[in-house]
């Protein structure tokens, strides 16, 4: 999908207004792991401003290399480490993620950080995910080099 296709899809999605009133942990895989079978969920958070082929390729490679069943993309709501920087509105970044992953059956998107409001901290999101999914779901946190550089902060 080209950047122009993504922009056009975002425009269409904004025009249609998805109507979500509550945060969705997952949009496609909300019942993931509820059957009791062992499974692996990759978690890929980021600003995604914009999401691009590099993000998608890294996620797919991690899925293959780690034997992950699905990857959950989580666009940040109010990223504390990007204060003072200009970033696209969260609703636009969420729509871009939805458009970018739409054709991959192993990818899903979550709006939990955006819906939560306030400052966005990864630990809060991971706690929410751990509480949502049953113990048979192994969580794998995937991070880019830019995120790893801020871990000590």
Model-derived regions, located:
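Nucleotidyltransferase catalytic core that binds NTPs
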Residues: 25-153
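N-terminal polyanion-binding entry modules of DNA glycosylases/AP lyases
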Residues: 1-28, 34
């Amino acid at each position: 999908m080209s950047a122009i296709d993504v922009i056009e899809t975002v425009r269409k999605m904004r025009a249609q207004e998805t109507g979500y009133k509550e945060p969705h942990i997952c949009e496609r895989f909300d019942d993931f792991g509820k059957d009791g079978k062992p499974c692996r969920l990759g978690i890929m958070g980021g600003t995604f401003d914009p999401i691009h082929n590099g993000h998608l390729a890294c996620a797919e490679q991690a899925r293959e290399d780690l034997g992950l069943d699905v990857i959950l993309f989580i666009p940040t709501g109010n990223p504390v480490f990007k204060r003072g920087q200009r970033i696209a509105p969260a609703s636009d970044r969420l729509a871009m993620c939805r458009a970018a992953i739409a054709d991959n059956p192993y990818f899903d998107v979550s709006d939990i950080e955006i819906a939560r409001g306030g400052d966005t901290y990864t630990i809060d999101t991971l706690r929410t995910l751990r509480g949502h999914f049953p113990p048979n779901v192994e969580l794998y946190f995937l991070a880019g080099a830019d995120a790893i550089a801020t871990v000590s902060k």
